[in-house]
């Protein structure tokens, strides 16, 4: 009798729904699921009926996130990469090949100072790939973006929002609004907003005043359930929301003058890669082959 009762209890427990988070997000039906790789190198956000394929990839040395997005409902499965790193290009291309995707764009949120972008290397390995960055960055690329521009892969598009402050040319890429676009929306914020933080403003024409205005006018005005995916994380986080950062970000929740004081007193060390990364990234990550990055 005890065994029968135990077996029945076990059966009931197995039938209970499992939740990945104690804070459910308002999601359209059918609800997307967030899966974390056992190796911690990639994540996916999709649903059984969604046309979006999404992967969050991580480069350990610079703590950089690279994002892969594709429209898998399109016959060609067009894809783009946001903030690729030179050291992980082969990993990214292997994944793209395994998933049967066609890489169209290699995009940067800004000219990075802590790693060399993978866009130039991607172009040499896949000559049809177009490098993309903001016009305000002043760097080389195939396509230059301005605020309000849209980058499309199949029926999915990213809206370009200017978010300078960490550097003069920073942009945030935001997935489109409307029932035909992935919901909730996703914001790829570069270094403008980090999870419970933000990028430094003491080099590359940075401005704490400008960063504060950018975040509050271009990111914090998005729906509160918009998912925030930053370019870096140093504390083991993967994703946040606009609502979370508006409530809990220890810097950006302050008034502007307090924020500027915080930023001016960070006393951060000189970035160890800046003298290599910035010159390389100004020519699409290929100092020795500038003709590949025009």
Swiss-Prot record:
This protein's UniProt keywords? Acetylation, Dioxygenase, Iron, Metal-binding, Mitochondrion, Oxidoreductase, Transit peptide
Alphabetized Gene3D superfamilies for the sequence: Ribonuclease Z/Hydroxyacylglutathione hydrolase-like
The UniProt catalytic activity note for this protein reads:
S-sulfanylglutathione + O2 + H2O = sulfite + glutathione + 2 H(+)
Q: What is the lineage of its organism?
A: Eukaryota, Viridiplantae, Streptophyta, Embryophyta, Tracheophyta
Report the enzyme's class at the first EC level: oxidoreductase
Protein name in UniProt = Persulfide dioxygenase ETHE1 homolog, mitochondrial
Q: Which InterPro entries match?
A: Metallo-B-lactamas (IPR001279), Mito_Persulfide_Diox (IPR051682), POD-like_MBL-fold (IPR044528), RibonucZ/Hydroxyglut_hydro (IPR036866)
Cell compartments where the protein resides: Mitochondrion
Q: What is the documented disruption phenotype for this protein?
A: Embryonic lethality at the early heart stage, due to defects in endosperm development.
Q: Which organism is it from?
A: Arabidopsis thaliana
Q: List the EC numbers from the record.
A: 1.13.11.18
Q: Which PANTHER family match?
A: PERSULFIDE DIOXYGENASE ETHE1, PERSULFIDE DIOXYGENASE ETHE1, MITOCHONDRIAL
Gene Ontology terms for molecular function = hydrolase activity, acting on ester bonds; metal ion binding; sulfur dioxygenase activity
């Amino acid at each position: 009798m005890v065994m029968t009762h135990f077996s029945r209890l076990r059966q009931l427990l197995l039938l209970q729904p499992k939740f990945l988070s104690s804070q459910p997000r308002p999601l359209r039906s059918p609800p997307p699921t967030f899966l974390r790789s056992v190796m911690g190198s990639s994540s996916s956000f999709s649903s059984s009926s969604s046309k979006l394929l999404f992967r969050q990839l991580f480069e350990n040395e610079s703590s950089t996130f690279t994002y892969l997005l594709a429209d898998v409902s399109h016959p060609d499965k067009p894809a783009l990469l946001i903030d690729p790193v030179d050291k992980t290009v082969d990993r990214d291309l292997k994944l793209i090949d395994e998933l049967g995707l066609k890489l169209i764009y290699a995009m940067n949120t800004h000219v990075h100072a802590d790693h060399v972008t993978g866009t130039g290397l991607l172009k040499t390995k896949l000559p049809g790939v177009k490098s993309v960055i903001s016009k305000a960055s002043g760097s080389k690329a195939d396509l230059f973006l301005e605020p309000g521009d849209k980058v499309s892969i199949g029926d999915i598009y990213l809206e370009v929002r200017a978010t300078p402050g960490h550097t003069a040319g920073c942009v945030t890429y935001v997935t489109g609004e409307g029932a035909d676009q992935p919901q909730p929306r996703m914001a790829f914020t570069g270094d403008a907003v980090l999870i419970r933080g933000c990028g430094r403003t003491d080099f590359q024409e940075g401005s704490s005043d400008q960063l504060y205005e950018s975040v509050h006018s271009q990111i914090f005005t998005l729906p509160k359930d918009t998912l925030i995916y930053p370019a870096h994380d140093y504390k083991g986080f993967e994703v946040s929301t606009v609502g979370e950062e508006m409530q809990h970000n220890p810097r950006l929740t302050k008034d502007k003058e307090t924020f500027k004081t915080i930023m001016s007193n960070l006393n951060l060390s000189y970035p160890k890669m800046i003298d290599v990364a910035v010159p390389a990234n100004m020519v699409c990550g290929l100092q020795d082959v500038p003709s590949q990055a025009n």
